[in-house]
Amino acid sequence: MVYSYSEKKRIRKDFGKRPKVLDIPYLLSIQLDSFKKFTDQDPTGERGFEAAFRSVFPIKSFSGNSELQYVSYKLGEPVFDVKECQIRGITYAAPLRVKLRMVLYDREAAPGTVKDIKEQEVYMGDIPLMTNNGTFVINGTERVIVSQLHRSPGVFFDHDRGKTHSSGKVLYNARIIPYRGSWLDFEFDPKDALFVRIDRRRKLPASIMLRALDYSTQDILDLFFDRVNFKIKKDSLVMDLVPERLRGETASYDIKDSDGSILVEKGRRVTARHIRQLEKSKTTELEVPVDYIEGKIAGQDYIDPDTGEVLVSANAEITLEDLAKLSMAGIKEISTLYINDLDNGAYMSDTLRIDSTTNRLEALVEIYRMMRPGEPPTKDAAEGLFQNLFFSEERYDLSKVGRMKFNRRLSIGEDEGSGILSKEDIVAVMKNIITIRNGGDEVDDIDHLGNRRIRSVGEMAENQFRVGLVRVERAVRERLSLGDLNELMPQDLINAKPISAAVKEFFGSSQLSQFMDQNNPLSEVTHKRRISALGPGGLTRERAGFEVRDVHPTHYGRLCPIETPEGPNIGLINSLASFARTNSYGFLETPYRKVEDGVVTDQIDYLSAIEEGRYVIAQANIDIDKNGRLLEEQVACRHKGDSTFMRGTDIQYMDVSPQQIISVAASLIPFLEHDDANRALMGANMQRQAVPTLRADKPLVGTGIERIIAVDSGVVVVAKRGGSIDYVDASRIVVKVNESELRPGEAGIDIYNLTKYTRSNQNTCINQRPCCSVGDPVVVGDVLADGPSTDLGDLAFGQNMRIAFMPWNGYNFEDSILISERVAQEDRFTTIHIQELSCIARDTKLGSEEITADIPNVGESALSKLDESGIVYIGAEVKGGDILVGKVTPKGETQLTPEEKLLRAIFGEKASDVKDSSLRVPNSVKGTIIDVQVFTRDGVEKDKRAVEIEEMHIAQAKKDLTEEFKILEEGVYGRARNLLLNAGFEQAQLDAIPRSHLLVQTIDDEAKQTELEQLAEQHDELKADFDKKFEIKRRKITQGDDLAPGVLKIVKVYLAVKRTIQPGDKMAGRHGNKGVISKINPVEDMPYDENGNPIDIVLNPLGVPSRMNIGQILEVHMGAAAKGIGDQITAMLEEQRQLAEIRGYIKEVYELGDEVLQRVDIDSFTDDEVLRLAKNLKGGIPIATPAFDGAKEKEIKEMLALAKLPTSGQRTLYDGRTGNEFERKVTVGYMYMLKLNHLVDDKMHARSTGSYSLVTQQPLGGKAQFGGQRFGEMEVWALEAYGAAYTLQEMLTVKSDDVNGRTQMYKNIVDGNYQMQPGMPESFNVLLKEIRSLGINIELDQD
């Protein structure tokens, strides 16, 4: 493999043994592609805005004299960029403008004669735009729209599993689910009659539906039944014989063949042999006794030819009397329905008998009554309602997916078709459910991923946009019908508010629009790849059963079987598997390699769950030779959801990668194959809660996917084009682009501005640091700057800690963790948290609030950190209770005493009419002010601080743009200089020419002269562009802010808090091994090894066996080896060994392992590159052990041997307090530990006095409300059991809801009198009132 310059800085040794056939696709593509389809122009009109507009327009007036037509749309440019929107707290959105055409028809002339046409562009609201990282900025906060897994439109057949009826009989049902419109259900009742329901309302016999579709009784019988024909003889009947129909019957007469010989005697069962004999003898008719027809059902009406009387009506049972009547009337042939209890039930015939309707109108009226009970039906109303239910394109749409699923399920040829239902569709569904009831077909599995599809951002936004358009449509239609249309323009007809409201509601408050989890890069990526079954049109967690939540065989390679929440949402919220994608229909697909005749090809096909069922698929870890031929005789494979063994030649596909089945979070766990699934789930979930540490530390033992996640998440800065680093500082990187990658006539400079110390959604710190130096060569995709939780482009949200598994004085009881003081001193787990505190000055009824340093009754010391505007300085260190922004609020006028009046008369208006409402630092918070933002309403005078901040921003913007301009200008001059040198100018000559004159020189060569003129043009463009950009920036900075109504000014203060690790903080490994720090031990007391190196963290060995997460032990051993190799390299460097020796050792390390595919050609590295690599490996060689394809035990031992460590992975440790050797050897190594976002500082809380609940008068609960600790029922039992009567009394009275008692108690404590007088608890009064509300008079008898 060829490594770029930046990749050579640190190479991760990979133990993967399977070749990489397919790279993991871009992780955020599910979000970006979906939204792109929504916003991109689509000429076909099948999706996005185009589809929504075409479905609603043209809008015709009721009279038909005018219509509003859609022409085209365009999305404008957003006013502010993403960062500005976040700072200002506004939505990152672009205006949508639509060109509409209003057509007026001439009433007097021929129909369709156009009288007037008006075209105009109309504003239709702002549409939120997606950022490059797949998020939306809504009201200044980053949000993610989670994709939804919902039931695909189409037709589904199911049964009730025998739960509906007491007999336990299985009742089948069919449901046609459209994308939009009414649901249509068919179901059997316990008596085997077929019923229909519309939108889950009252059920009606299914034949009513057919009658409403204009089928007569005769048509219905013809549709659903075969016929048996009888010829009437004198004293017998001759039946047309279809031998197959006799199978399984007991003969009620002798069955003879055409020769008259008896094949089946009366009373014998007809077997398959008898049927073969009948077919062989070519018998077509069979004589049967007359009573055989009794009870059979007539297939049509039989009418007396003379009188016209109906002798036997269709669907009536035939009796012997009926037969005699028919015979007398001269009818020679009778047709009956073929009904057989085994495989041809009389369901439709029974349904017709319970149907009271006889014609179409009656059926329509019955449906109208069911849909609109209480309304009097008219013919037109009934017709209109039924027509609109399933046959109107405005009200009903199966969608492309629904039609495809419908046609495939009912084996109708093509996948295309109309979005509405036809008569034939409804009949086909009824026929199919009857076939299922007859045992001829299977019901569907609704948890199969072929029946559930993904609805992503774009689709949901389009649906919501369409909802807004439909609201507008009604209003437009009304306006077209009223008023003088000659005066109106399209703009006057359209009100954009309903559209904006619908879109805003979706992005702002939909269940699937979620506040982005921004703890670390992994949590961002996972949140964007989340698939939820909840949300509008989805499931609810209360109703979701076990089957929906369970892992289904079709999840393989599509949804991760490991990563899901642990609580009530388990199984309802899933994560996309690493290689999965959605197809054009919205179904999940996963890639497979094609196998032909036992040979694996390089062809890769993406298969959906439906397609996968047709193939035999082998796993990725099967043995193949170098030509791709399968080596095993019997290969483990999957077919139709079952695991089995088959011959190599029968295999049709194989997996592309062992990590195919798991999500990105699960594939970050090394040695995942050795962990129990439950613990792996916890490990995957807890990695998302890891807080970025102050100094990121790459994991020594990784899986090789760390770089992919870091790059795809967008937190690192990646080179867009190749070149070399021209300039680097903490906030900017400038790359001089390679000549080969230049676009014609550009300066060839790429500038990357870095994000510095900004706040994430979870209050963690986002900061980017350059990881390149001036002069470094760069290729496309190189990481130029690390973001939060990344180290040289690798994801790094924890620290490599030296671990020992041993008990230590009970301090690791029940998963507690003992850590060394050194860890805290070295700031290994120190994190920075940035809080945003806001102070809002409003316009109140009594006057305006004011932000000022002139605050009543506040001492000088409290104001020491404020400037003259009353706003805290940047850099000030503040603690709980300090004033950040001084604010005074007008008080209501109070009655003044004569003395006060006198004082006011003497001293004028005093500050007594305002109260202090300043913004203070919350209790228990201590930190540094890192930024202040002031937003002032338009028209309100800016204070001094706001002006200063503005000037600072303008100066910064000017500095940035000037530097950018200088760099670009230098690029232009540099190219001009080269051009002039090539044209024959001398270097000395060029040095004498002033820079500004370089571009106006004349050259004899015409082509070069043209090129120089182009450069001069480009320079002028750059200058104009600089002026324009600066003007835009200046205008943005100086313009007033659009604040909420009644708000005059907002001051936002950003407070950075440094949190070191401390007892009570939660930590975890990557294998679900979590615990809480119990003690921070002095370094000298920690166990140490024979070299005197102390242990950093002591974990409990009892936490491993029962949890079955053995992966952590292998990680510790491999970590020890990786660090040991780093120590060996460090020793070599310190001893200044020969570079050849160091090169040899590094080469040996990278070549270690069986069948390892990675090839690092260390010999091709220059000496400098080897030296830099060695320096970067001093802390340990990073290792990749991919999930299900990782390092084996033998390889770990080889690594330990190479690091000159005991291959057992255990060593002798000594007690730091006594110096004595511990009894037995201890497992010591390096584990990657994470600090989770469950910090004791955020949870620790104590209450003195505070607010109380209004009804019960008990203290509130929780830190946010400054609440008390709950003393619950079980705690009361505990005190009762101890007999602690006085403690119990004070708990239930003065410390809780005895209002008078607690007030008195407070006074007593203040006075130094420690006594209490308990009274009546308020909750007793609540109980009394509740009993009285039940109508029971209860009175308290107080003695």
UniProtKB/Swiss-Prot annotation:
Biological processes, Gene Ontology terms: DNA-templated transcription
Catalytic activity reported: RNA(n) + a ribonucleoside 5'-triphosphate = RNA(n+1) + diphosphate
Residues that span the membrane, as ranges: none
Subunit field text: The RNAP catalytic core consists of 2 alpha, 1 beta, 1 beta' and 1 omega subunit. When a sigma factor is associated with the core the holoenzyme is formed, which can initiate transcription.
SUPFAM superfamilies (UniProt xref): beta and beta-prime subunits of DNA dependent RNA-polymerase
GO molecular function, one term: DNA binding
The keyword Ligase is assigned to this record: no
UniProt-listed InterPro entries: DNA-dir_RNA_pol_bsu_ext_1_sf, DNA-dir_RNA_pol_bsu_external_1, DNA-dir_RNA_pol_su2, DNA-dir_RNAP_su2_dom, DNA-dir_RNAP_su2_hyb_sf, RNA_pol_bsu_bac, RNA_pol_bsu_CS, RNA_pol_bsu_protrusion
EC number: 2.7.7.6
Pfam family membership, one: RNA_pol_Rpb2_3
GO CC annotation terms, alphabetical: DNA-directed RNA polymerase complex
Keyword Transferase among record annotations: yes
The protein's name in its UniProt record: DNA-directed RNA polymerase subunit beta
Species of provenance: Shewanella violacea
